[in-house]
Each structure stands twice: as C-alpha cells, then as structure tokens.
C-alpha cells in the first residue's frame, strides 16, 4: 500500500474503527487501509504477537492504533473491549469482523461428521452476533455506525466438500441483511464483503491449513490450486488481492457509501456473478 500523510481528508478521517481478527491477513490489510484513510484503529484478536506486528505496520504509515487481546467467541470479553474503546475514543464508528476459524473443507457430505459441519456454522455466526451486538449498543446511542462482515462465494455456489463453510457464509450474509433491518432506523449500516480466495492470505491466515487438505486431494499445493481456480473459474482470470478487499472495506465503511446497507459486495473477480 502507498504511504500517506494524514491531512484530515481521508475517507475515514476522525473515525474510530474496531477490527476483530486484526492479526490476520484481511484484518491486517484492513487496519492499514483504515489508518491510511484517517481512522484511529483498535485491533482485537487472540494472538498478541500477530496484533503487535500489524500495529507496527500501521504506525509505520503514520496511523494511530491500539491493541487488545480479545476472544471474539466470548460475549463478556467483546463487550468489555467495546466499552474500553468508547472510554478511550468516545465512540465506535466502524466494526469489522475479520475473524478466521479453523474448520474442515474438502470432505464429501458422506465423509463429513456433524461436528465438522457445525463447527464453522456455529463459530462464525456466534462471533458475528457477539461482535455486532457489542458495537451496535454504542452505535445506536450515537446515531450511526457501520458493521462489516466477510463471506465467500461459497454462500451461493454449491460444490462438494464445502457444505459447512458455505452454510456459514450464507448465514453471515443473512445476518447482514437482518442487522440492516434491525438497526437502520438508528442510522447503523450493515455490509458484507464477499471475496473469493486471496492467494496472499495463505501466508498469514488460517486459509493455508484449510486449503491444504482440499489441494492435497488433487495432488496440488494450495498455491497451485488457487492459480488453477483463477484461470478456470473467474471472469477476470485472477483472484482478489488483500489491498483490493481492504480498500473496499474502507470505502463501504465511509460516508461515500452512506446509501448502502444490507448489501453483499461482490469481490470475487467474476467467479460468481450476481
């Protein structure tokens, strides 16, 4: 990303942004994009070292960032963190759920156990409910805010081996629409970014372990599998980058997207067409 000098004219100038999963690939990229657009960023996640690494990158581009270790699956921990953010910064304008959870992909329905199916469905929906509820309490009081989620084209494209995660992504998109309906009268927007697989994310997210089993069944590495997918299955013959997804998050968190709520943003490079 390009380093900016903060002049108060960024898309998110003066905004307070909370990122859960802030130590991950997408969360870290979003932290940089938000900071470059003028937001004060609060990173939350389970691994302090990874959060600190992202925070150093944010500070290197002149951003203001704070770090807290938070388990997004624990309501009291997330609520307490939201309260601390408001004490420190006065408000919460944006919350991004960029959480990644380990789960099984690549097994056929016949092979998959109930727990393997349920783990991503329960984990991802639980986390988003907890995160959105904690932030929305303050957004309602202040008369506005933006709740951002992430999903994948698995939400709408069926295929063998992806049932649990596909259902989880569909549920996150449904939650986005219902949050928009619940909170719109209070000026709170809800947006979900539907991105296809991001090759760069293999380096610092749970996706390498998830894709490894799928790729191995085809005698491929995760990198080779994604390259083949990009060539065969996307209209643009490529997959999205971390920067592209992060910049989309910054835009939809900003006032320039103030007419958008309950929307699922297609960032699939054409692997799925609306």
Task: Enumerate the predicted regions with their spans.
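Short C-terminal tail/terminal secondary-structure segment
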Residues: 2-7, 106, 237-238, 249, ...
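Conserved glycine-rich cofactor-binding loop
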Residues: 16, 23-25
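Catalytic loop of short-chain dehydrogenase/reductase
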Residues: 101, 148-171, 176-185, 194-202, ...
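Catalytic Tyr-X3-Lys loop
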Residues: 110-130, 144, 148, 172
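Short, small/polar-rich loop/turn modules that mediate ligand/substrate recognition or access, typified
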Residues: 184, 189, 259-262
